[in-house]
Design a protein with these regions (language model features):
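Basic/polar phosphate-binding segments, predominantly the helix-turn-helix DNA-binding elements
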Residues: 183, 188-225, 235, 244-273
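Amphipathic alpha-helical segments enriched in hydrophobic/aromatic residues interleaved with Lys/Arg
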Residues: 100-167
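His-enriched metal-coordination microenvironments in redox/metal-binding proteins
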Residues: 34, 219, 241
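N-terminal regulatory/effector-sensing and dimerization cores
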Residues: 3-106, 137
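Amphipathic alpha-helical interaction segments
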Residues: 143-150, 173, 177, 194
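N-terminal positioning helix adjacent to the helix-turn-helix/winged-helix DNA-binding module
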Residues: 170-178, 214, 223-226
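Short, charged, intrinsically disordered terminal tails
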Residues: 161-162, 272-275
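Basic, amphipathic alpha-helical hairpins
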Residues: 127-139, 154-162, 178-190, 210, ...
Length: 275
C-alpha cells in the first residue's frame, strides 16, 4: 500500500472491532490515549514516545504497543519522520482470546512493552494486516480469523500480563469522580468550578490532581472524550455536522481540528474507513 508522504490514513478493515491506520509523517502527536489496544510496526524512520512507562524509541521493524487509557505522545526521531502501520482492537477481543487460551476468565490485561523487537510478532501483524486491510487480495473470512487469533494469542502469551491493582476501587476518589462526570457527558460545557465542587476541592487542587492522576489536564481529557464520542456518532451513520454538534464541538471545523491533532486523520477519512 502506497500513500503520499506526510499523511495519516485510516483504510477500511474487514474485521469487526478492529481499526487500521497507515502513516508516513513527521507530525508530533500531543499526549493522548486510545480506548482500544494498539499494535503496530515501524516500517521506516524512528519514533519516540513518552508514557507512564518512560521514554522509548522505536525504529524500523520494531513492534509498538499501547493499552487502552494509556496516556502517551509521539514524535519522530528526526525531520525525516517515520512510517508505520497500526491496528486498534476492541478490548473485549483480547479478553476473549485470553480466556480461550487459559481456560479461565480474564477480565483485565495489559501489554507490558511499549516497544519490542519481536520478529514473530512482526510477521503475525503483517499477515493480519494483509488479509484484513488489503481485502481484495484475500477475501477469505477463515484466513482473517486464523490470522487474528494467531496474533492475539502471541500477544497474550508473550507480551501481556494481568495488571496489579494498587488499591481498592470500590469507592471512587475525588479525581475519579471528576473523570466519571466528563465520561458521562463529554459534550457538556463543564467548568473547573463544576468539577472541583463535585470533587470537594479547589480549582487549583482539581487541576493539579487531575493532571497527575490522568496524565492530562481536564480540558485535554474532555477534548479526547469528545473525539471518541464523535467517532461513535459517525459509526452510527450520523453526518459530520451532526456528530460535531452531538459531541459538543463548536462546529464541524472545530471537530476536524481535534481529529487531526489527536488522530492525524480527518473525520471524513474516519467515516470513509467505516463504509
Amino acid at each position: 500500500m502506497t500513500m503520499p508522504r506526510g499523511r495519516v490514513h485510516m483504510p477500511r478493515c474487514a474485521i469487526a472491532g478492529v481499526e487500521a491506520t497507515v502513516a508516513e509523517t513527521a507530525h508530533a502527536f500531543p499526549r493522548h490515549s486510545h480506548d482500544r489496544f494498539g499494535i503496530g510496526v515501524i516500517l521506516s524512520g524512528g519514533h519516540r514516545s513518552a508514557s507512564g512507562r518512560g521514554l522509548v524509541e522505536a525504529r524500523a521493524n520494531d513492534a509498538i504497543m499501547v493499552n487502552p487509557g494509556e496516556v502517551h505522545d509521539g514524535s519522530p526521531l528526526d525531520e525525516r519522520g517515520r512510517t508505520w502501520r497500526m491496528l486498534y482492537f476492541e478490548p473485549s477481543m483480547f479478553v476473549t482470546a485470553a480466556s480461550e487460551l487459559t481456560g479461565a476468565a480474564a477480565r483485565e490485561l495489559e501489554l507490558t512493552q511499549p516497544v519490542a523487537h519481536d520478529p514473530l510478532l512482526k510477521r503475525l501483524f503483517e499477515r493480519l494486516f494483509s488479509v484484513a486491510v488489503e481485502v481484495p487480495f484475500v477475501p477469505d473470512d477463515l484466513a482473517r480469523e486464523e490470522a487474528l487469533l494467531e496474533l492475539l494469542g502471541h500477544l497474550v502469551r508473550v507480551h501481556a500480563t494481568r495488571p496489579i491493582r494498587s488499591s481498592s476501587t470500590d469507592a471512587l476518589g475525588p479525581i475519579a469522580q471528576a473523570k466519571a462526570r466528563i465520561d458521562d457527558d463529554p459534550s457538556s460545557a463543564l467548568t473547573l468550578a463544576d468539577l472541583a465542587a463535585d470533587a470537594g476541592m479547589s480549582r487549583f487542587q482539581l487541576l493539579r490532581g487531575f493532571a497527575h492522576e490522568m496524565g492530562l489536564p481536564p480540558h485535554a481529557y474532555r477534548m479526547q472524550r469528545r473525539v471518541v464520542l464523535a467517532r461513535q456518532w459517525i459509526a452510527r451513520g450520523a453526518t459530520l455536522a451532526d456528530a460535531a454538534a452531538a459531541a459538543g464541538f463548536a462546529d464541524q471545523s472545530h471537530m476536524t481540528r481535534a481529529f487531526v491533532r489527536l488522530l492525524g486523520v480527518t473525520p471524513a477519512n474516519y467515516a470513509a474507513a467505516l463504509r
